[in-house]
Amino acid sequence: MATLESRLADMLKVPVEALGFQLWGIEYVQAGKHSILRVFIDGENGINIEDCANVSRQVSAVLDVEDPISTEYTLEVSSPGVDRPLFTAEQYAAYVGEDVKLQLTMPVAGSRNLKGAITQVDGQMLSLNVNGKELVVALDNIRKGNIIAKF
């Protein structure tokens, strides 16, 4: 069965793209009785607040009709930012050589939190150089992954 995030991504991809943006990813965070639905969008020329407002109105209209979430939630629409979250194999592959921070569901090499450089993405497997040691992580074991911004 598909996760809520993947069902929402399927539902919202076309409306977001119709406005000229890419649906970068979706996070659904339950926080007690109230939850947060984060929709990340990207565009060729970046994203501004007006873009987020326009996408928010469109996404809100779709969610009102489809009603995929039965509890109260807050909708947030934003750009992925400099420490952008990564959701798909294609996104990880686009950042080979970059440093990432991963939170895992199951430990790899004794840890659920890893920081290292992406060395390769092969199908649904991610290779990561962590302190000179090559680790392989299944993408479905990644609970959350973010680029580590360099300043």
UniProtKB/Swiss-Prot annotation:
SUPFAM superfamilies: YhbC-like, C-terminal domain (SSF74942), YhbC-like, N-terminal domain (SSF75420). Gene3D superfamilies: Ribosome maturation factor RimP, C-terminal domain, RimP-like superfamily, N-terminal. It is found in: Cytoplasm. One of its GO terms (cellular component) is cytosol. The keyword Cytoplasm applies. The keyword rRNA-binding does not apply. GO terms for biological process: ribosomal small subunit assembly; translation. It holds the Pfam family RimP_N. Keywords: Cytoplasm, Ribosome biogenesis. InterPro entries: Ribosome_maturation_RimP, RimP_C, RimP_C_sf, RimP_N, RimP_N_sf. Belongs to the RimP family. Required for maturation of 30S ribosomal subunits. This is Ribosome maturation factor RimP. It comes from Shewanella sp. (strain ANA-3).
